[in-house]
């Protein structure tokens, strides 16, 4: 038995007046530190067992309290060892030795239901629309739970709701089922799947959008077409029909997020056709490159700060440009060149680029050299961010188009030789222009 389990046990006492057995007041932090430390060193595979350390903490916390209730709070370490091993074996056999439970997570997203399919794949699960009556039943169950602060949480939400919270046409209500051994794993896994799915949806919906240029004489903030829809404001978690807990997820939930609309709202059925990728794919694989770049794209497309948005897109370009070393000027050039080639590959080698797209690319070409010399201190404005997004658009679409057909070596070779071909074409075009 890890001595930290005994240290945690020693911080349990029996209240003199009520006889309640609990962790001593003022000892909660030390109790938690010891218990979590011992649990982490058990080395259980989170995804294999579909558990979290937090779920294990809850089980072992309950187990130590039960031992203290049955055998007292003054056992020696040797006396505790036998009782603890019995309790630990029970936890492992009765909990880890049986199939995981099914948890149901319901949540709102700020998209009109008519713009969202009835069902969307989430790699290992699916998100299904529920109607307003079903949503209201779940909402009431959470509001009426005496042990939950959800009712107070709802009062803090900023959006202009109708008479009943969240009951309005701008919202879609979704339900996802997830196999898990504790509610924390269910929440963790579903939030991962929702994050990558929204990254995929946002990517295809915002493809080739470059934003609107800021008028030179105006102090007005530029109109942005990009979405802030990064994750639901909260999840409600249920098991066997009973409300378990809620979890706020969008940590800007107190700030009004306004309405969200798809650029391609008429193409709602196409959302179901958008490919899904494994959130847990090895980062060194072709699929892992796509997932990492999609998450960088999601950060960029939902980030308010132009500067932070730019560097999120830039991180995606670094991943997909497939260069070996980003610390020198030549590889910064490779990153931009390969991004430009991927972009032009989808636009008939530059002939069909809209004027605002060309301006954005010119901005990023100028910025690449400052990034080498000034690094993170360099000034970033909207045009640079737009250019970085477009380069990532081109690279991501190319990777997704060739998914299942090419490997990383194939892609690297295509980008390398594509840039060389493009440079030769540009050289010949310039030469012929000069001669004429």
What residue spans do the PLM features occupy?
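Polyanionic, low-complexity intrinsically disordered segments
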Residues: 1-93, 326-328, 340-342, 352-367, ...
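Charged, non-catalytic interaction/linker regions at domain boundaries
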Residues: 59-311, 315, 385-436
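Residues at structural and domain junctions
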Residues: 286, 299-303, 350, 354-357, ...
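Short acidic alpha-helical/loop segments enriched in Asp/Glu that coordinate divalent cations
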Residues: 307-313, 322-342
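Acidic, metal/cofactor-coordinating or nucleic-acid-engaging core segments within structured domains
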Residues: 347
């Amino acid at each position: 038995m890890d001595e930290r389990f005994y240290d945690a046990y020693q911080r349990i006492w029996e209240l003199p007046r009520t006889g309640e057995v609990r962790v001593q007041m003022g000892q909660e932090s030390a109790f938690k530190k010891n218990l979590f430390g011992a649990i982490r060193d058990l080395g259980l595979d989170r995804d294999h067992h579909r558990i979290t350390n937090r779920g294990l903490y809850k089980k072992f916390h309950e187990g130590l309290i039960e031992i203290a209730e049955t055998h007292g709070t003054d056992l020696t370490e040797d006396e505790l060892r036998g009782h603890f091993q019995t309790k630990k074996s029970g936890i492992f056999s009765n909990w880890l030795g049986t199939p995981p439970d099914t948890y149901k997570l319901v949540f709102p997203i700020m998209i009109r239901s008519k713009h969202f399919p009835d069902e969307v794949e989430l790699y290992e699960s699916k998100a299904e629309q529920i109607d307003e009556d079903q949503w209201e039943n779940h909402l009431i169950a959470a509001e009426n739970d005496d042990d939950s602060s959800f009712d107070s949480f709802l009062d803090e939400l900023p959006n202009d709701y109708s008479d009943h919270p969240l009951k309005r046409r701008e919202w879609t209500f979704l339900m996802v089922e997830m196999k898990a051994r504790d509610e924390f794993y269910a929440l963790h896994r579903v939030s991962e799947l929702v994050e990558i799915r929204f990254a995929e949806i946002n990517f295809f919906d915002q493809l080739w959008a470059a934003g609107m240029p800021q008028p030179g004489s105006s102090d007005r903030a530029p109109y942005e077409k990009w979405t802030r829809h990064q994750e639901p404001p909260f999840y409600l978690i249920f098991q066997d029909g009973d409300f378990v807990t809620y979890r706020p997820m969008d940590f800007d939930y107190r700030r009004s997020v306004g309405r969200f609309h798809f650029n391609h709202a008429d193409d709602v059925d196409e959302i179901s056709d958008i490919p899904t990728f494994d959130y847990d794919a090895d980062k060194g694989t072709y699929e892992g490159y796509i997932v990492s770049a999609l998450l960088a794209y999601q950060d960029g497309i939902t980030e308010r700060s132009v500067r932070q948005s730019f560097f999120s897109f830039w991180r995606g370009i670094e991943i997909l440009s497939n260069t070996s070393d980003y610390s020198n000027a030549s590889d910064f050039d490779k990153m931009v060149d390969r991004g430009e080639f991927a972009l032009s590959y989808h636009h008939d080698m530059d002939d069909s680029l809209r004027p605002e797209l060309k301006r954005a690319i010119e901005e990023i070409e100028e910025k690449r050299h400052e990034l080498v010399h000034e690094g993170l201190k360099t000034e970033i404005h909207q045009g640079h961010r737009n250019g970085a997004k477009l380069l990532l658009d081109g690279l991501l679409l190319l990777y997704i188009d060739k998914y299942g057909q090419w490997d990383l070596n194939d892609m690297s070779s295509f980008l390398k030789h594509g840039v060389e071909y493009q440079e030769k074409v540009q050289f010949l075009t310039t030469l012929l222009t000069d001669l004429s």
